[in-house]
Amino acid sequence: MRTAFKLMLGVTAITIMMAGCKSMNKTQKGAAIGTAGGAAAGAVIGKAAGNTALGAIIGATVGGVTGAVIGRKMDKQAEEIKNEVPGVKVERVEEGIVVEFSSEILFGFDRSDLTADAKAKLSDLSKVLTKYPDTNIEIQGHTDNTGTDAYNMQLSERRANSVAAHLRTLNVASSRISIKGFGESAPEYTNETDEGRAQNRRVEFLITANEKMKEEARKEAGETGN
């Protein structure tokens, strides 16, 4: 009961903070969100917002001055991804980065093997990922609502696995990579139109600080031992 109450308070506090901080940049928001977030709170917020990437990144948030240091590092990395990988959506979210690839770029219809264009773009992305090795990378597969729930879940997992496997061939360490398939369960766009369904067929990369980056950021922020 006490844990649930603390989680509720954490979720409420973060939700209020996010609603009132629209004028803040991503680095400032990273500093404002405290460790009250946590993985559980992040998952709740992500589900409520219909945004699995948001929830996962909030779950990895450190907050405070350390969070601001991490945010600056992520600002730099996000800009490099935008420059190196044109045509994909790159968004700074709190202390992380979300890179969104349309499935039309990566795969043929109803397939999970990568296209030649996909391999070229993933090669470009890997150059930035290997330059900044102190991050974790969660690869999320998503589909539209065409087909059965079970089939879409399997397809999203196969696609996420294909992307992860190719990144490993490009010298992105396996220890940094995790994958999740969401099937049709987490649409970011409407499934009522062809355009919306096409946008929901996507693969997202969630880039967050690993423990080494967090520890270095704590030292830089003078918060070692906190």
Regions found by a protein language model. Name each.
Residues 47, 68, 72, 84-88, ...:
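Structured segments of extracytoplasmic/periplasmic soluble domains
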Residues 74-101:
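Amphipathic, membrane-active segments
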Residues 1-9:
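Bacterial N-terminal signal peptides that target proteins for export
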Residues 16-20:
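C-terminal motif of bacterial Sec signal peptides marking the signal peptidase cleavage site
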Residues 142-216:
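Periplasmic OmpA-like peptidoglycan-binding domain that tethers envelope proteins to the cell wall
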Residues 22-79:
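Short, low-complexity, glycine-enriched hydrophobic/amphipathic alpha-helices that associate
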Residues 83-84, 107-141, 168, 205, ...:
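Periplasmic peptidoglycan-binding/anchoring modules of Gram-negative envelope and division proteins
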Residues 31-32, 39-43, 76, 80, ...:
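Extracytoplasmic/secreted proteins, especially bacterial periplasmic and envelope-associated proteins
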